[in-house]
Amino acid sequence: MKVVEKDLDKGYIEVLPETLDDLWHLYHVVRKGDLVFALERRRVKDERAETIRRDKGERKPVYLGVRVEDVEFDKYANRLRIKGVIEHGPESGSHHTVNVTTGKRIKIVKDEWERKDLERIEEAEMSRPPVMLVAVDTGEGTIGIVRDYGLDVVARVRHNVPGKRGGDRRAEMRKFFHRLADEIERIAEEEGVEHIVVGGPGFVKSDFAEFLREERDIPAHVEDTGSAGEAGLIEMIRRGAVERAVEESRVAEEVKHLEEVFKRIGKGDDKVAYGVRECLKAAEFGAIDVLLVADEKFREAMVEGEEDVLNAVKYAERTGAEVLIVSTEHEWGERLRELGGIAALLRFSIPTG
């Protein structure tokens, strides 16, 4: 989760949820009586319209402040539904539902922020890894870090590479790649970068991404842009490259843990649990290292109030376990669903029976 703006003296925090986990955190933070602001599309009537014809209004973007009456999870989509009455904006006094999805900013205003709510937002924010963007073209590389306040260009690498007919072109390109890779490794270590996106025009970006993977064992996501330099970095951000890189890495992490789950099941290892009853028991013992919950199972639990699933998540969080809401859009998520929609890797085995 990204904290966009925070002013506790004025009682508000503006956030940008980036994953389903972030929606889970917000579900526990937003409560009845809070005031939530969001940019919504709402039908606005034209008061100047002729009275002879009925004006149904046109849907326009409006910034609304809604006094919360209820918060629920949409059963058929990965989104929160925040229901309430409009206090700020057109048609004050009308009921409205703010649908919160990943990538949608909301401002939460409370009379008083409880410590547990601040800690939950801080926890969600800390789980947001830094992303490095690299715009590359022949002999020119620009490196940027995506920070909370925006893009920070941290390095530029230039190297004289001969034209296509130059005899030393290939050798000089390799020298350039090595120099750029050295900078990437140095900055990634300093910044704690987990995701790298390489973009640029032409084929150089793909060649460099392959070089990083084969020569330096550094995985990178590739994005096509119309330009290199800082303009290329900005273009990557506008095209949603950061969000895609984080999501792809998240799926890779889910797959890694699920592979380990099935590996332990196959070996008869007792440091694994699956199914609601077993996972709840493991959570109560404080034995869970990683808890994996299928997104469909999680939605159903929130909508239908399936306490065993919600308690397994709550107890796992309290004991420092990593909790992942797993997409069932990929094969391994489907396999998790076959295990009852919930599984856990354990720190230690728990008593049976």
Swiss-Prot record:
- Asked if Nuclease is a keyword of the record, the answer is yes
Task: Kindly state a single biological-process term from the GO annotations of this entry.
Answer: RNA surveillance
Recorded hits in SMART domains, A to Z, give: eRF1_1 (SM01194)
**Top-level class of the enzyme under EC nomenclature:** hydrolase
Requisite cofactors: a divalent metal cation
Which EC number(s) does UniProt give? 3.1.-.-
Q: Could you tell me which NCBIfam families the record lists for this protein?
A: pelota
**Function recorded in the entry:** May function in recognizing stalled ribosomes, interact with stem-loop structures in stalled mRNA molecules, and effect endonucleolytic cleavage of the mRNA. May play a role in the release non-functional ribosomes and degradation of damaged mRNAs. Has endoribonuclease activity.
Q: What is this protein called?
A: Protein pelota homolog
